[in-house]
């Protein structure tokens, strides 16, 4: 067969066509969307540096102290104010010798979502390698709580929330096949290996309440405890899972987001802040619609390059507030140029009018007065 005919087969032509399109329309392909109604205020946030990367989740203890953050080297750190700074509080693995401040080492663990149980002071930790763990109010080495549900290992515990009245811990297992280090494989491949799990803290029983999800990332319980919201990073869709009342056991689409979601936090008034890792662009849309596009890039490029594409060529910061009842978008806050805030993983609003922001990669957290955007 002539070479000219061989190269025109669908399998061999697709990468060539894709490369040509990328060459001529590069800025249009990776450029992030411009969103209507956004407030460009995140660049005004105060930066609090850390000595290590990746404060992915933030939490405050029952006394209001903190925030506490889980970082790349497997530790949970506590903020003690400007004078004392960040201090060690807990860790998820006893193996500390080879832990890195910049790269995740599986044996060191990777604490992701953090949730304090208010009545006991115990901190529940979703670790991206070991499962769900907890540590007492004094900190130290965390103990394993859940590493299996319905006969399948918890491989990638991501974020959880506690129903204190019912003693139930809800959490995401973003993949029952892959660990945290394979997060972008799970995201780009289109595999439906994520699930939401209900853990009875008294009976010590774990039950799957939603399955076959594409990288369920954030999770939060509604203010009245009647439903759980979880968002899929691969589809930009948030699901509402009813856990009480006449709709218990059913689920529905709660919101469609303008980007790839990470963690979710309920506000003091019952709405939800959702952190977006990046906004949509043509590249992320192509990956969403055609999973072979994601697999192609994943198999031919370095992960850093893929992340660069997903972020539109530059890291930026964006968080979205959803109505706690309808899922309607109420607020969009951005640092579209990434001047201050970037790679956002969580936004946590406190009762004293502060919005704390974490990052899955950057060695910093940020804090913004809610009055800055409420007045706009």
From Swiss-Prot:
Glycans are attached at residues 98, 172, 224. It comes from the Eukaryota. Keywords: Glycoprotein, Signal, Vacuole. Belongs to the strictosidine synthase family. Pfam families: SSL_N, Str_synth. The keyword NAD does not apply. GO terms for cellular component: endoplasmic reticulum; vacuole. The keyword ATP-binding does not apply. Residues 1-31 form the signal peptide. InterPro entries: 6-blade_b-propeller_TolB-like, Strictosidine_synth_cons-reg. Gene3D superfamilies: TolB, C-terminal domain. The gene is SSL8. It comes from Arabidopsis thaliana (Mouse-ear cress). This is Protein STRICTOSIDINE SYNTHASE-LIKE 8. It is found in: Vacuole.
């Amino acid at each position: 067969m002539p070479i000219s005919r061989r190269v025109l087969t669908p399998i061999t032509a697709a990468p060539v066509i894709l490369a040509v399109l990328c060459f001529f329309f590069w800025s249009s392909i990776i450029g992030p969307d411009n969103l209507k109604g956004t407030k460009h205020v995140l660049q005004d946030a105060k930066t609090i540096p850390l000595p290590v990367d990746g404060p992915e989740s933030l939490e405050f203890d029952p006394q209001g102290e903190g925030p506490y953050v889980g970082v790349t080297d497997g530790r949970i750190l506590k903020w003690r104010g400007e004078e004392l700074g960040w201090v060690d509080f807990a860790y998820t693995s006893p193996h500390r010798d080879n832990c890195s401040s910049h790269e995740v080492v599986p044996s060191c663990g990777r604490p992701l979502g953090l949730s304090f149980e208010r009545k006991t002071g115990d901190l529940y930790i979703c670790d991206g390698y070991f499962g769900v763990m907890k540590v007492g109010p004094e900190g130290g080495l965390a103990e394993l709580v859940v590493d299996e549900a319905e006969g399948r290992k918890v491989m990638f515990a991501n974020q959880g929330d506690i129903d204190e009245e019912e003693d139930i811990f809800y959490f995401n297992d973003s993949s029952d096949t892959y660990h945290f280090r394979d997060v972008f494989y799970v995201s780009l491949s289109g595999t439906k290996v994520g699930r939401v799990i209900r853990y009875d803290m008294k009976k010590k029983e774990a039950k799957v309440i939603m399955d076959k999800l594409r990288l369920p990332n954030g999770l939060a319980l509604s203010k009245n405890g009647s439903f759980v919201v979880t968002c899929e990073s691969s589809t930009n869709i948030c699901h509402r899972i009813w856990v009480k009342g006449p709709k218990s056991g059913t689920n529905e689409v709660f919101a469609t987001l303008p980007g790839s979601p990470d963690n979710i936090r309920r506000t003091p008034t019952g709405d939800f802040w959702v952190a977006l890792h990046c906004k949509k662009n043509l590249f992320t849309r192509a990956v969403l619609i055609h999973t072979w596009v994601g697999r192609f890039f994943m198999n031919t490029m370095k992960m850093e390059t893929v992340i660069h594409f997903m972020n539109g060529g530059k890291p930026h910061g964006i968080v979205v507030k959803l109505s706690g009842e309808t899922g309607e978008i109420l607020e969009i806050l951005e640092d579209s140029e990434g001047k201050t805030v970037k790679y956002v993983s969580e936004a946590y609003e406190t009762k004293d009018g502060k919005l704390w922001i974490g990052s899955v990669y950057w060695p910093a957290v940020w804090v913004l007065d809610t009055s800055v955007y409420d007045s706009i």
